[in-house]
Swiss-Prot record:
GO terms for molecular function: DNA binding. Its main location: cytoplasm. This is Nucleoid-associated protein Cvib_1034. It is found in: Cytoplasm, Nucleoid. Keywords: Cytoplasm, DNA-binding. Homodimer. InterPro entries: YbaB-like_sf (IPR036894), YbaB/EbfC (IPR004401). Belongs to the YbaB/EbfC family. Binds to DNA and alters its conformation. May be involved in regulation of gene expression, nucleoid organization and DNA protection. One of its GO terms (cellular component) is bacterial nucleoid.
Length: 109
């Protein structure tokens, strides 16, 4: 059985690292959206799960509890979609070498 070439393995690891940096830059530009209450609350989140925008219909501002619930629902929806998109992009680059969930845990650090 032939041993893998350590130099080739190191080169592959370096290439994968460079690709991952490119993916993270791309994810910062990728925007997903979430909404709640039939569009009364809308949010945008980037692929690194940073909240970019929040829009609240002025007609619902008098009901503070409802606004809070809708904001939470919209943000969670956008973050879930962002996480799905991020995992897909990371999986394309990782090709089974790296667990995307482990990378996502460290993205916010």
């Amino acid at each position: 059985m032939e041993m893998p070439n350590l130099g080739d393995m190191m080169k592959q690891i370096q290439q994968a690292g460079a690709k991952m940096q490119d993916v993270q830059k791309q994810l910062e530009k990728t925007v997903t959206h979430g909404e709640a209450g039939g569009g009364m609350v809308k949010v945008s989140v980037n692929g690194r799960q940073r909240l970019l925008s929040l829009a609240i219909d002025p007609d619902i501002m008098d009901d503070r509890e409802m606004v809070q619930d809708l904001v939470l629902a919209a943000v969670n929806s956008a973050i879930e979609e962002s996480g799905r998109v991020s995992q897909e992009e990371i999986a394309k680059v990782a090709g089974g070498m790296i667990n995307p969930a482990d990378i996502l845990k460290n993205m916010g650090k």
